[in-house]
Amino acid sequence: MITRLSTLFLRTLREDPADAEVPSHKLLVRAGYIRRVAPGIYSWLPLGLRAVRNIEAVVREEMDAIGGQELLFPALLPREPYETTQRWTEYGDSLFRLKDRKGADYLLGPTHEEMFAATVKDLYNSYKDFPVTLYQIQTKYRDEERPRAGVLRGREFVMKDSYSFDISDAGLDESYAKHRAAYQRIFDRLGLEYAICQATSGAMGGSASEEFLAVSENGEDTFVRSTSGNYAANVEAVVTQPGVERDIEGLPEAVTYETPVSETIDALVDWANSIDVQIEGREVTAADTLKCIVVKVREPGAEEAELTGILLPGDREVDMKRLEASLEPAEVELAVESDFADNPFLVKGYVGPVGLAKNGVKVLADPRVVTGTSWITGADEKERHVVGLVAGRDFTPDGFIEAAEIKEGDPAPAGEGTLTLARGIEIGHIFQLGRKYTEAFDVQILDENGKRAIPTMGSYGLGVTRLLAVLAEQRHDDAGLNWSVEVAPYQVHVVAANKDAAAIEAAERFAAELSAAGLDVLFDDRPKVSPGVKFKDAELLGMPFALILGRGYAEGKVELRVRGGEKSELDADQAVAQIVEMVAQARN
């Protein structure tokens, strides 16, 4: 097909939008792909919608190739199914809730596990119906507290979500592996740089969980990779190597000291070394001190939050994402001044595990805080610290928690060297849900022995509209976007750069021949626009190939520009065949 720029609904911008922070947001707005309606809500203009449809086509091809069957559920959903799985409350404020005129509760779907499970229950009842994989490409809604970065983190977005239903765990393993491979093919076809990372399951529940993260310095997610081996994980899923337990017998008793100059960990360490305090016969370091972070944890459905103490080695900061992931589906926030005022036993800057335990506050510790480890920590009195407080003797945590930051150079699991940190954007997430949702909806079938059985589920999400923004993040330069042939709204951008009648007529002919060869063509036929503006727009819009008809056409030559690559001069009579071949090669 041919689309003429003279009639295309498009207005390009030379300046970045004021609210744009990341390249994808700036360029998609400037190039006329999207337009802001409200915070986190965007319109898809013709070029943007064509690119999204191209991504959807790749996703459909690969989902169909593994036996997926497409359907479509409504975005407006009743409350009841989400009450069944408790996610009406677990989702908290991120759920868009509304009432109809009769007062009945509804929501705008953030995800559709409940609907898939309930529908399979209604229609299938025999092992002969399984396995089955169903998917949809649907608009989702989440009330993000801080929507940002354009369509990278919005309140309305398009996702592909698919769900596998199997009789056995072995069947689930197979379905999971098929989806994993399909996602790799999708992202490879789109030309993405990505990592497959171990992840937490969060509110989804289930067991095995992996994220596909597009590598980007503007990513909100931090992930780690091992320097040797294949280990990769979202930072929220990294498991800390536990400390070594020691024999308590014979360890010195804890001693409380006045510490008037100890408001920071560094100051506390300097004080300890100034009076020759030693830990295991050596000088004190920050790792020998114990921070006690006070947080408030509110379980789903609970009216009030409960105080909880989080114990971390002093050389580590709390990582709120890791803390939140460890406590999901509960909500967690740091204690504030009013919490200290309401609880006088909380002496800010001097809180310790002993005082918390005496006052009935739950204490969760970093895995390095094991029996026999000795610490310098708060004595629950102003300007006083205790030295030699021993875990398992002087205090015992109620449990362990992954809440400490991960650092570059930390040991990788299974002896695979050390960890390196990188940033990424989540583009896909796959889960082995198991029977969480099928049990919740009492999905029962008869197995081959005539006995009752409950199917097991897999859940597989992929952000379609986010993918377009991620590709813009990874594939751009100072001049504009740089799409692959799989994603580009048009494979070829024909530019009539010469106002000579013969050149304009030839540009029409080239556009027609390229279209007849099966390519989508964007034809810049604007008569009153200068060649310089046309070239700038061509780079900004980002089609993979631009065919320029300029002064050289009189000598039988045309110019081919590969976006982000080289410029070359072609014989006019061979140009169409060469471009068709180059597009085919780019697809492969």
Curated annotation (Swiss-Prot):
InterPro entries: aa-tRNA-synt_IIb, aa-tRNA-synth_II, aa-tRNA-synth_II/BPL/LPL, Anticodon-bd, Anticodon-bd_dom_sf, Pro-tRNA-ligase_IIa, Pro-tRNA-synth_IIa_bac-type, Pro-tRNA-Synthase_IIa_type1. Its EC number is 6.1.1.15. Keywords: Aminoacyl-tRNA synthetase, ATP-binding, Cytoplasm, Ligase, Nucleotide-binding, Protein biosynthesis. The gene is proS. One of its GO terms (biological process) is prolyl-tRNA aminoacylation. It catalyses: tRNA(Pro) + L-proline + ATP = L-prolyl-tRNA(Pro) + AMP + diphosphate. Pfam families: HGTP_anticodon, tRNA-synt_2b, tRNA_edit. CDD domains: ProRS_anticodon_short, ProRS_core_prok. Consists of three domains: the N-terminal catalytic domain, the editing domain and the C-terminal anticodon-binding domain. This is Proline--tRNA ligase. It is found in: Cytoplasm. The lineage of its organism: Bacteria, Bacillati, Actinomycetota, Actinomycetes, Mycobacteriales. GO terms for cellular component: cytosol.
